[in-house]
């Protein structure tokens, strides 16, 4: 019904190098909005957006879901319809700031010890070693691991910006054991045993939570806790914040357009917190 509109959204989004998942989310949000308004495209106004988003807010949806709708419809109005859009009139929903869950080094060690599956153990170690997202660890390839430079190459991450992050000695040992015992994969580093393709994020989240439960961790944990813990432990060890931001692939807080990158030479001077697991 709205295929021509979706094609325009895809074309405009691709020109801006947006990820496929973002484009899909934009199209879904716009479809919900258009079905709700049931108006001709030419007759749409920002009042229609305000009514739609207000109803969504009153329905009790989360700030994250609300802002997904907001982003998709905003893109549609500004880039496709070429209509004026004032963020002061149609603001995003503010999210409650919650402190991320950070695991201690002892807790991370316990989780690793409670993970009998060698592939799963290698993935958990890799996520903590370099602060990887789940989507990043599942898409690693054999060639992304540098034994000599002790780095992990993250390709096309969430921000569509390649980066290098840290490979701890302990992680390299686990990866080496996994590689020799699990078929010496040369393509995808952690392929699905069933399909040979990339593992799903849900499967990684599930086995991590099972390992945390076996380890007796009482905190509410997710795989993202490993990323938070990586950053927190580096900061505690005195690592410069700008290097932590670069290792995580975050944008510079002073500019949403510029990324901070760390050279391989600089990486050689930073130790992964996994290499400090000898004590708290």
Regions found by a protein language model. Name each.
Residues 1-280:
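Conserved catalytic core of the tyrosine transesterase superfamily
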